[in-house]
């Protein structure tokens, strides 16, 4: 031996490390390297720190800003800088990508405020610092004594002592600097990290020296010094790992009352053992978890921070590369821990082999060595467990960050996408350009399953399809699927990527090396089998990819269809279409189940192959070993090899699983990327930063402009282009009232959209102040108004909140202004009627309010805002005439609009135009007239009637009354300046009612999942015989495993005449190596196959060799047993999956039928997001997550049963240990299950707010962008993302908490197993003892996985539990009552009679209709009028039994409708609701969704509602519509009538049609049925007066139909047969309108006519109709009197 480090290898001799290794390495080289690295690192960091202090400080990655009203006095910024930088500086790209859309979506302004508090200093912190200093000083003293005392030189050489003394003096200096400079400006960074690292390394180095000193002491003094040194070093090491990390104060962030995260307070020991989770587990055990108790995320894990950092990373071409680039640091760290875990996975097996060799030859080594091996069994596995758990925890952190990024990006994209008018795209569908080119390379790829070999099913029709239009967009259902399912798929894969690129390769490499050492050249056939398996695995991956694409495409279609059904459930119920639409959804569901079936077939085949591979490796290796090489297969060789083969199977399983899931995630990430690549709105480019023209003047104008909906090259199927605005050149008057008029479908709404930048600009310029975020615009200090826009959509858009929040829309609350707006928008009376005043929750899209109420709240929101410019789209159409008068006079022309621009689309020309300042008249996409109001009126552009009226009146005359009509401001004062401040405007009437405002919050179950939930799923899978067959298959599969173990033992024993065999447990390496992920992520087949490996294989060392063994016989039998096991595994999976699909089909059908047949009230109080959560994520869990876990649970339970039987028969004494271990596991499970199930339920519940917000945003994106409020919605989205991620990350923290503790208990089992082996030498037969112990270790592992899988099963059954909750919602009456079916032609006459009818929305509420009695004769036309809350809509609901009678009854043709089935009733009568409801499809599918009418009938109905003009030619049934070709130049083009082609596309909710066109289409749908009773709820509110007049003529021609019209336009019903006036749910008046108008001043109808300002016109129409009716009656009487 020469100099230092020249020791000879091996360094382990018999029972100890060599003195050379201890001296050269443990005393000199390794400590010197550690100190050198510390000094270099300190020097580098100190220099960089000094350099950074000389520069100006850089801004944090996201700068927190005020969050409006959420800020609190004394709040501090949340810019807590994390300890380590998440992103390398060279990856940052200035601020590129942070500001989206002119800064409107800038993440740098989306952080919220929070309170920062200093964490309490631990009580023993000061004492620990003193003890640390004393311990280091003691170590210095030890080395001084060793240096001075010659007796210590045995263990302390001179060089080693000097190095040691230098080390501890250096550490003493560092510790002192930490103590005195920790809180000063001279603080040296990361000193604690240095001291802790040195303590840890020194402790590890000393372990070997300490054992050597105890086993072979050189001298008494040296032994004492080593003991003292080891004790003091151990003290420092354990102090370092058990005290809080770092040498600085920890700051905790309190945000909105949410408890801060505690992870950053944890010590190293607490972090690695997840002891910091104890508090969560204990809290969950004591009482159910609620969201308010769930800790917050760490600041660096919050969505805003993650997204901000992510967008700073340089973008790459592909989304997955961008994500990998961002997470490269975390992935490398995860890989490091995974490699460590993979290395230590083999340690227990090799230690057991060493123990068995000692058992065979006890004299071969000292007893102390084997006890060292026994101690190392649990120690090495604890190290493996620490690495494994750390890698998985890092993966979980990556997972939540990926989910935050993807959901955040999808939401931001939803705010930037074009306003949808085109057709839907299928995300993930194969594009032509993606097809691989032909050629040799392509063929090779195809052979290796690397190419695109999954042809599209309808690829044969591909040539017929046109190129994809640039206006193709993902529909709402698809986007919700991207957010809920695809982002989940991708994020889950990222949790386990280390299995693919670190863990599995490491284990494969180590197992191959060890196998080669054991078998030599005979291991090569096994390696060849492994290599040949790779293409097979890739093939399975491609198959998974293909099936997953189909599943996602089918799922998109089903969810979109379900979303449409639930969105439009009211019209579906009115028309009794539930069963028909359910069948339509079921068809899509069948396609989805078919795709799932294909995936499960692939999965089962993959499982069979993966189970067969280890058998093939074993077979061919043993075949070569015994028959080619002619070597005896000794037990030691056989069982060591089999143990390694089983070890080898685990990474192979991981690789197969991960390849499949990576392929599935690739499908999802491609779909997300395709959505993120969709065309975006060019609104921000069109509007720019300001609305200043070339002269520097602010204007609102469209200059020489042309616009189109969708892309510039959008061509429809018939060759026509999308709707366009042509030759638009107009400038609106700022600060004045501007009116846009024109017939239905002329382009009025499109003109507003063009102003807002929502249409595609073909040429020209747009001037409007809407290009900047509202938060960036400062209001004028004098007027309080800002240069921003407010927009009121034609179809009112409200968020799921209370009325007050909808009006404030995050603006600061000003009580006086708020009250003035309430009065001006005629909302006082409504707030008095509503249970909770303005605290009433209005539900998604305002579903609990009438159309007029929603429209007025939307108007109030715009008026209350500080926007200087208001764009109002027909906001008066949904209110009655006198309310319209009031709003126009007191709101639109009132003091609240002073100095504000109002651009208003309206059909109420007589009311609005005469008092406007500027008028624009549209027709067919062009401006036909514009100018001052009087000029346009007198030109006749608005009709001769108003022109004549204008000539006879002065422009200043107004018929609007000066007082407040009683129907609007009753009891609330007559002036906007009233400041009495009645509490009912802003507060509920009383505390009891206030509780009702929370009715729409989603509930969650508590406690364990109940048996009825389990029973629902199990019974859905199959009857008793299904489970009998399943039990037989599972038992057979388990039996094949046991028989194979016994057969190997029998074969190996043939080579010896005397055997002392103790098995190497194949499960000893398995403790937690397959840590659980959600079953969607890591298939449970892996777990089940782990169980097969765990059940033990014996190894025996022969004493006398018997060479006369028929190896071929044993090989063949072994192969048969193995193939039988693989076959049963295949059948097992296939059978359970078959049952799973059956259950999925049954549960979905029941859920759909139950929800569609729920009462109307259910849809009023349940947000769409909650319902869609059940149909998407919960249903996906039922489809794909429950069944694999069921397989795992049954396998573990059988494994435990087999283990207990074997142990009881071989070593009954071990049952005592098993009892205590089981008790420990049960206690762990009890604590874990209590907290984990609640956290899982909270995570499920917190998905709904995300669903809800996505739905709201998608339907209201135009309004959000118009207000410039995207940033607030992004902020809200990030908060909701955090809300979902909070319970999720702590759920997985409890999972890791369980994993480490169960691993620890398993290590105790292995430890005692080793002790048992040593103590039992010569007492029991070694072979059977080995099998018993092998199964004993498997017993602990089986219980571990049973606990884990049962926990996951409970979490998955939470989805079934939530679905079951919906299966029990209150149902409507039966669709058909066989005993009370009406006649087939009922109603033949059409008479309707109410007899003392009373009803209410709920039993505990006041009646909405009281003792209503009246009769409508056959073929009569009756108008229903009354002020808001009078009961008009309730009466219509009552006719359709949407409200059931509390008293009285309704008769139609003398039949009590309460006694017949709902389908019989609703199919016999028809309603046209106020809100038009259309479905994605075509005009034909919307009018006649079930193909009941001919094209001629459909065209006739379109003509009757004026959608096809009298001068337009209706195409014949056998000819395509002949439409004029559209000129290519915009100037000469014109818009075509799309209604001439029944195949014209209708977008989601009819978004490509105007509101008026939608109403007319719905009316046409109703007229097609030619009903005997027709109810019209303000069905023509959004239609211009001229068209409305023609439609009324059509309705009057319906002589055989009884018509009940709820009207706001009194002109509509002035000539009806009767008018019913309601007030507070009671009949006030009921007679002919002329008779009611003659009552005088006291009549309710008369006062309404007076308020409308058109009394003369109404009286004239009513009298004319009255006289005509009298003549008819006289004629009828004369006819009756004639003989």
Swiss-Prot record:
**Xref: SMART domains:** AAA
> Where located?
Membrane
Q: Does the keyword Membrane apply?
A: yes
Can you tell which superkingdom this protein's organism belongs to? Answer: Eukaryota
Q: Where is the composition biased (Acidic residues)?
A: 81-93
Q: Which residues form the ABC transmembrane type-1 domain?
A: 338-664, 1028-1351
Query: What GO CC terms are in its UniProt record?
Result: fungal-type vacuole membrane
Q: Where is this region: Disordered?
A: 53-93, 451-473, 952-998
Residues binding ATP, per UniProt: 742-749, 1426-1433
Q: How does it sit in the membrane?
A: Multi-pass membrane protein
Secretion signal: which residues?
none
Keyword line? ATP-binding, Glycoprotein, Membrane, Nucleotide-binding, Repeat, Transmembrane, Transmembrane helix, Transport
Question: Under what name is this protein listed?
Answer: ABC transporter 7
Positions of transmembrane segments: 24-44, 127-147, 157-177, 190-210, 221-241, 336-356, 368-388, 496-516, 518-538, 602-622, 632-648, 1016-1036, 1111-1131, 1182-1202, 1204-1224, 1304-1324, 1327-1347
Record domain ABC transporter: where:
700-949, 1392-1649
Q: Which GO terms describe its molecular function?
A: ABC-type transporter activity; ATP binding; ATP hydrolysis activity
């Amino acid at each position: 031996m020469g100099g230092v480090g020249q020791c000879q290898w091996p360094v382990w001799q018999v029972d100890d490390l060599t003195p050379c290794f201890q001296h050269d390495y443990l005393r000199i080289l390794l400590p010197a390297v550690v100190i050198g690295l510390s000094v270099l690192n300190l020097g580098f960091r100190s220099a960089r720190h000094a350099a950074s202090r000389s520069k100006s400080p850089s801004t944090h990655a996201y700068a927190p800003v005020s969050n409006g009203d959420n800020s609190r006095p004394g709040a501090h910024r949340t810019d807590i800088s994390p300890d380590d930088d998440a992103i390398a500086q060279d990856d940052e790209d200035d601020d590129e990508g942070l500001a989206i859309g002119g800064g409107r979506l800038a993440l740098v302004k989306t952080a919220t405020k929070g309170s920062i508090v200093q964490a309490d200093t631990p009580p023993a912190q000061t004492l620990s610092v003193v003890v640390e200093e004393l311990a280091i000083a003691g170590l210095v003293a030890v080395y001084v004594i060793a240096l001075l005392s010659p007796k210590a030189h045995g263990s302390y050489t001179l060089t080693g002592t000097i190095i040691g003394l230098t080390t501890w003096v250096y550490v003493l200096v560092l510790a002192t600097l930490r103590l005195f400079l920790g809180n000063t400006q001279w603080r040296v960074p990361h000193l604690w990290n240095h001291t802790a690292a040195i303590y840890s390394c020194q402790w590890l180095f000393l372990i070997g020296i300490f054992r050597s000193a105890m086993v072979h002491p050189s001298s008494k003094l040296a032994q004492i010094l080593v003991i003292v040194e080891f004790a003091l070093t151990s003290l420092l090491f354990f102090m370092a790992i058990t005290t809080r990390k770092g040498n600085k104060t920890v700051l905790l962030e309190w945000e909105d009352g949410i408890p801060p995260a505690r992870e950053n307070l944890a010590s190293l020991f607490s972090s690695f053992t997840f002891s910091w989770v104890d508090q969560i587990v204990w809290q969950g055990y004591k009482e159910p978890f609620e969201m308010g108790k769930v800790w917050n995320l760490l600041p660096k894990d919050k969505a805003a921070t993650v997204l901000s950092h992510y967008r700073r990373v340089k973008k790459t071409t592909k989304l997955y590369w961008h994500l990998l680039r961002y997470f490269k640091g975390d992935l490398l760290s995860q890989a490091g821990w995974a490699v460590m875990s993979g290395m230590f996975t083999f340690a227990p097996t090799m230690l057991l082999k060493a123990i068995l060799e000692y058992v065979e030859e006890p004299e071969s080594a000292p007893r102390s060595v084997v006890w060292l091996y026994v101690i190392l069994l649990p120690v090495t596995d604890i190290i493996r467990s620490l690495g494994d758990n750390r890698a998985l925890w890092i993966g979980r952190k990556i997972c939540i960050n990926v989910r935050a990024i993807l959901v955040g990006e999808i939401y931001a994209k939803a705010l930037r996408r074009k306003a949808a008018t085109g057709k839907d795209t299928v995300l993930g569908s194969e594009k032509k350009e993606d097809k691989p080119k032909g050629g040799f390379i392509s063929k090779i790829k195809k052979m290796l399953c690397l190419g695109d070999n999954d042809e599209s099913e309808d690829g044969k029709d591909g040539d017929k399809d046109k190129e994809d239009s640039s206006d193709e967009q993902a529909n709402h259902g698809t986007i919700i699927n991207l957010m809920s399912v695809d982002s989940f798929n991708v994020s889950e894969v990222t949790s386990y990527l280390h299995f693919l690129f670190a863990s599995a390769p490491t284990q494969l490499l180590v197992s191959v090396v060890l196998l080669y050492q054991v078998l030599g050249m005979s291991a090569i056939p096994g390696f060849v089998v492994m290599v040949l398996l790779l293409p097979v695995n890739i093939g399975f991956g491609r198959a998974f990819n293909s099936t997953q694409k189909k599943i996602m495409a089918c799922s998109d279609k089903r969810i979109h269809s379900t979303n449409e059904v639930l969105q439009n459930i009211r019209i579906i119920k009115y028309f009794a279409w539930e069963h028909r639409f359910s069948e339509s959804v079921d068809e899509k569901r069948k396609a989805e189940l078919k795709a799932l079936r294909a995936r499960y077939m692939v999965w089962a085949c993959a499982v069979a192959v993966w189970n067969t591979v280890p058998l093939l490796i074993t077979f061919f290796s043993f075949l070569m070993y015994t028959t080619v090489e002619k070597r005896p297969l000794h037990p030691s060789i056989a069982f060591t090899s089999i143990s390694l083969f089983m070890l080898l199977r685990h990474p192979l399983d991981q690789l197969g699983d991960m390849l499949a899931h990576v392929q599935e995630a690739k499908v999802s990430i491609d779909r997300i990327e395709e959505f993120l690549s969709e065309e975006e709105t060019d609104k921000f480019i069109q509007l720019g930063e300001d609305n200043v023209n070339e002269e520097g003047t602010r204007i609102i104008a469209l200059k020489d402009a042309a616009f189109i909906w969708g892309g510039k090259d959008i061509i429809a199927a018939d060759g026509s282009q999308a709707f366009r605005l042509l030759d638009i050149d107009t400038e609106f008057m700022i600060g004045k009232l501007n009116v846009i008029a024109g017939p239905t479908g002329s382009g009025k709404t499109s003109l507003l959209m063009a102003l807002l930048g929502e249409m595609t600009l073909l040429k020209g310029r747009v001037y409007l102040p809407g290009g900047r975020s509202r938060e960036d615009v400062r209001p004028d200090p004098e007027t309080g108004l800002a240069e921003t826009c407010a927009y009121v959509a034609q179809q009112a858009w409200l968020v799921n909140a209370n009325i007050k929040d909808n009006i404030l829309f995050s603006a600061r609350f000003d009580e006086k202004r708020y009250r003035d707006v309430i009065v001006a928008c005629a909302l006082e009376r409504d707030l008095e009627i509503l249970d909770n005043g303005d605290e009433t929750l209005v539900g998604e899209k305002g579903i609990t309010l009438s159309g007029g109420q929603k429209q007025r709240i939307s108007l109030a929101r715009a008026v209350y805002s500080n926007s200087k410019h208001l764009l109002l789209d027909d906001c008066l159409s949904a209110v009655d005439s006198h309310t319209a008068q009031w709003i126009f006079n007191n709101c639109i022309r009132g003091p609240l609009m002073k100095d504000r621009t109002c651009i208003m689309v309206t059909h109420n020309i007589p009311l609005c135009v005469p008092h406007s300042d500027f008028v624009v008249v549209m027709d067919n996409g062009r401006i036909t007239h514009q100018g001052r109001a009087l000029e346009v009126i007198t030109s006749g552009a608005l009709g001769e009637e108003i022109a004549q009226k204008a000539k006879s009146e002065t422009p200043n005359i107004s018929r609007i009354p000066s007082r407040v009509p009683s129907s609007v401001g009753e009891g609330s004062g007559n002036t906007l300046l009233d400041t009495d401040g009645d509490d009912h405007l802003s507060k509920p009437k009383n505390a009891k009612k206030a509780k009702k405002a929370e009715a729409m919050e989603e509930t969650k179950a508590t406690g364990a999942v109940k048996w009825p939930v389990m029973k629902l799923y199990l019974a859905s899978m199959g009857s008793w015989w299904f489970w009998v067959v399943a039990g037989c298959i599972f038992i057979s599969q388990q039996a094949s495993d046991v028989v194979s173990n016994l057969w190997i033992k029998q074969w190996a024993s043939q080579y010896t005449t005397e055997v002392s065999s103790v098995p190497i447990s194949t499960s000893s390496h398995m403790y937690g190596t397959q840590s659980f992920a959600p079953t969607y992520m890591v298939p449970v087949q892996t777990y089940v196959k782990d169980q097969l490996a765990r059940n033990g294989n014996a190894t025996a060392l022969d004493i006398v060799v018997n060479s006369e063994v028929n190896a071929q016989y044993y090989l063949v039998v072994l192969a048969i047993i193995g193939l039988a096991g693989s076959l049963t595994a295949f059948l097992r999976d296939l059978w359970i999956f078959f049952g799973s699909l059956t259950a999925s089909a049954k549960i979905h059908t029941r859920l759909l039928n139950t929800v569609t047949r729920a009462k109307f009230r259910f849809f009023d109080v349940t947000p769409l997001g909650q319902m869609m959560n059940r149909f998407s994520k919960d249903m996906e869990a039922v489809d794909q997550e429950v069944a694999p876990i069921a397989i795992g649970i049954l396998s573990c339970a059988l494994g435990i049963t087999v283990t207990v039987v074997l142990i009881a028969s071989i070593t009954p004494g071990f049952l005592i240990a098993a009892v205590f271990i089981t008790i420990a596991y049960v206690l762990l499970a009890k604590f874990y299950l209590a907290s984990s199930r609640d956290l899982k339920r909270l995570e499920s519940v917190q998905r709904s707010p995300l669903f809800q917000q996505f739905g709201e945003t998608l339907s209201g994106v135009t309004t959000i962008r118009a207000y410039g409020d995207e940033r607030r919605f992004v902020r809200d989205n990030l908060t909701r993302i955090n809300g979902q991620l909070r319970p999720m990350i702590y759920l997985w923290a409890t999972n890791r908490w369980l994993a480490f503790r169960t691993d620890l208990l398993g290590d105790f089992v292995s430890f005692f197993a080793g002790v048992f082996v040593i103590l039992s030498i010569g007492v029991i037969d070694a072979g059977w003892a080995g099998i018993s112990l092998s199964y004993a270790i498997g017993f602990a592992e089986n219980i571990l996985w049973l606990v884990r899988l049962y926990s996951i099963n409970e979490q998955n059954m939470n989805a079934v539990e939530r679905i079951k909750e919906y299966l029990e919602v209150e149902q409507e009456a039966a669709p058909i009552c066989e005993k009370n079916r009406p006649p087939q032609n009922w109603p033949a006459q059409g008479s309707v009679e109410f007899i003392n009818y009373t009803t209410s929305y709920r039993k505990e509420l006041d009646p909405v209709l009281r003792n209503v009695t009246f009769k409508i004769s056959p073929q009569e036309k009756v108008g229903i009028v009354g002020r808001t809350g009078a009961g008009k809509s309730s009466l219509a609901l009552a006719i359709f039994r949407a409200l059931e009678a509390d008293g009285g009854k309704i008769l139609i043709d003398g039949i009590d409708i309460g006694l017949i089935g709902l389908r019989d009733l609703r199919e016999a009568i028809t309603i046209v609701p106020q809100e038009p409801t259309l479905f994605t499809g075509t005009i034909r599918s919307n009018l006649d969704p079930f193909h009941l009418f001919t094209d001629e009938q459909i065209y006739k109905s379109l003509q009757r509602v004026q959608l096809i003009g009298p001068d337009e030619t209706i195409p014949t049934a056998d000819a395509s519509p002949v439409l004029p070709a559209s000129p290519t130049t915009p100037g000469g083009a014109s818009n075509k009538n799309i209604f001439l082609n029944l195949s014209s596309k209708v977008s989601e909710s009819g978004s490509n049609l105007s509101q008026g066109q939608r109403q007319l289409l719905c009316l046409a749908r109703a007229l097609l049925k030619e009903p005997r009773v027709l109810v019209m709820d303000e069905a023509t509110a959004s239609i211009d007066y001229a068209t409305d007049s023609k439609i009324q003529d059509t309705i009057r021609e319906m002589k055989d139909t009884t018509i009940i019209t709820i009207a706001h336009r009194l002109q509509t019903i002035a000539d009806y047969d009767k008018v019913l006036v309601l007030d507070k749910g009671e009949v006030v008046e009921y007679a002919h309108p002329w008779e009611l108008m003659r009552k005088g001043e006291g009549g309710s109808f008369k006062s309404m006519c007076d308020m409308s300002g058109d009394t003369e016109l109404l009286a004239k129409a009513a009298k004319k109709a009255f006289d005509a009716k009298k003549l008819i009656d006289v004629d009828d009487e004369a006819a009756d009197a004639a003989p």
